[in-house]
């Protein structure tokens, strides 16, 4: 079984890799590409960066002496991640940080030059990765089939293009989709235990009494990073904040109702929904209702048994009856009308 998994991963990565290793391009002026120009200037760092051009993205580094095999693998994974997002969401980010017409992913040196381990604009192109030189290169040397999933997370911020249709879940969307991309690429996840933990949180939540809105949104008393679940002694469980809870729910829905076919139908439906700005519990509930409607439409069945019975979303009897009577296989849904 392990041999089969290895060969499957190797086959996925080999199929998407360029025929020849990438070659570094001539240095380019990145003063309009880096996110925090002042930080680079204060650190007296050169803004002449080296481009490595992939199919969909331009990857910028400070060093042209990197192992071409490593950079080729890294860029191939990013390219496949970009294609996965574009295919499953049916959308693309607005152009912002580009080089020669291609979105940029910049490997920035350590030293507080970007927002944390990585940074990505929401709904627009441009990603910076701060762990590339100190961590990612070393991890590739340990496992040449590995890829750090934070690269797909930051691309997810670029690919959040749904405005207030799903804005309660922007960060959770990126957490969920990074794992969708990892599966599509077939790269080894060196933090696989983290994924298993996140997937397990759905069952922990289902067996708890935590309320739906407080768990999945920030409009019922908890901020994004606050733990949503507690152990038997009332202590916060690790890694169960709001984005994780959304991701664990979506990973379950994806697994149970059709894989990436379900994901693609879900985002197609979401794009047809009206925008609902979540300013209070009532509007957050309406945005969650859109989540349920799109999930049911993608699954071709009423998913209130999951959302309401298992996850404790509050709907009255009339609403539950309405869901039971719908023909969820109908391709001509008027999502705007349903959510008014």
Residue positions per predicted region:
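Long, well-structured alpha-helical subdomains associated
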Residues: 186-299, 304
């Amino acid at each position: 079984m392990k041999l089969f998994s290895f060969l499957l991963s190797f086959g996925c990565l080999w199929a998407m890799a360029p025929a020849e290793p990438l070659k570094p391009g001539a240095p380019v002026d990145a003063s309009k590409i880096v996110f925090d120009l002042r930080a680079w200037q204060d650190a007296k760092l050169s803004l002449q960066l080296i481009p490595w051009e992939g199919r969909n993205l331009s990857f910028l580094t400070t060093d042209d002496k990197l192992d071409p095999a490593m950079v080729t693998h890294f860029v191939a994974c990013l390219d496949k991640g970009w294609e996965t997002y574009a295919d499953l969401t049916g959308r693309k980010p607005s152009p912002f940080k580009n080089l020669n017409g291609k979105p940029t992913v910049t490997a920035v040196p350590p030293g507080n030059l970007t927002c944390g381990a990585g940074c990505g604009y929401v709904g627009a192109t441009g990603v910076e990765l701060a762990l590339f030189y100190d961590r990612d290169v070393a991890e590739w040397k340990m496992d040449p089939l590995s890829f750090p999933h934070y690269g797909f997370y930051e691309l997810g911020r670029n690919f959040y293009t749904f405005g207030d249709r799903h804005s309660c879940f922007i960060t959770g969307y990126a957490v969920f989709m990074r794992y969708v991309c990892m599966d599509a690429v077939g790269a080894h996840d060196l933090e696989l235990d983290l994924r298993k933990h996140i997937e397990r949180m759905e069952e922990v939540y289902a067996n708890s009494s935590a309320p739906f809105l407080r768990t999945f949104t920030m409009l019922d008393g908890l901020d994004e990073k606050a733990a949503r679940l507690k152990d038997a002694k009332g202590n916060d469980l690790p890694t169960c904040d709001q984005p994780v809870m959304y991701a664990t729910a979506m990973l379950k829905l994806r697994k149970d109702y059709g894989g990436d076919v379900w994901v693609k139908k879900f985002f197609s439906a979401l794009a047809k929904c009206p925008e609902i700005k979540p300013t209070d519990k009532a509007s957050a509930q309406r945005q969650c209702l859109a989540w349920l409607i799109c999930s049911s439409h993608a699954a071709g069945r009423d998913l209130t048994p999951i959302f309401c019975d298992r996850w404790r979303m509050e709907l009255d009897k009339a609403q539950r009856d309405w869901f039971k009577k719908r023909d969820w296989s109908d391709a001509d849904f008027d999502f705007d009308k349903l959510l008014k």
